[in-house]
Every structure is written in C-alpha cells, then in structure tokens.
Amino acid sequence: WPRGPDYTERRVMCGLQYVRAAISICGPNMQTMRPRNGSGPIVPPPDFLAMYGMARYKPPLSKKCCSTGCNREDFRGYCYL
C-alpha cells in the first residue's frame, strides 16, 4: 500500500501509549470499525481520519484494539474487527 514520507513516524495517542506506525495498527480498514460492544453502525470518525491522513492508506487488517481511552472523543470505544 502507499506510504507517506512520515509513515513510520505517525503517532496516535491511545490511552497513555504512543503507537508507532499507527496507521498499520489503528487504521486497517475504516469500513470495519464498530463500537466495542459489537453493535451499532460502522462509523469511521472523519475528522480523526483527516487529521492523520489515514484515508489514503489501506494497511492489512488488524484485530488489535487501539482505541480504548483514545484522546479523541469520537474515536473512543471503537475497535477494528
């Protein structure tokens, strides 16, 4: 997939951890994002994606949940399935 010049340096604050290569960890496929309880609509947070330019990337799917306690209110409580 395409990589931006700062791909490996992009960071997303999740709880107290800075996650390197956050796009590959926290931004797999925005269409698969659901609330942590498994119900509700599949809704990517547009301003969060725009902030980190994630919409341009399509990294491999990841089952890692990186959003518990994220510092973005509209991103909190979401997991990637």
UniProtKB/Swiss-Prot annotation:
Cellular location(s): Secreted
Q: Please name the SMART domains in this protein's record.
A: IlGF
> What is the organism field in this record?
Hypanus sabinus (Atlantic stingray)
Q: Which GO terms describe its molecular function?
A: hormone activity
Q: How does it assemble?
A: Heterodimer of a B chain and an A chain linked by two disulfide bonds.
List of glycosylated residues? N37
Alphabetically ordered keywords of this record = Disulfide bond, Glycoprotein, Hormone, Secreted
Per the UniProt entry, the disulfide pairs are C14-C66, C26-C79, C65-C70
- Recorded protein name is Relaxin-like protein AGF
Q: What does this protein do?
A: Uncertain.
Gene3D superfamilies xref list: Insulin-like
Q: Pull one GO CC term from this UniProt entry.
A: extracellular region
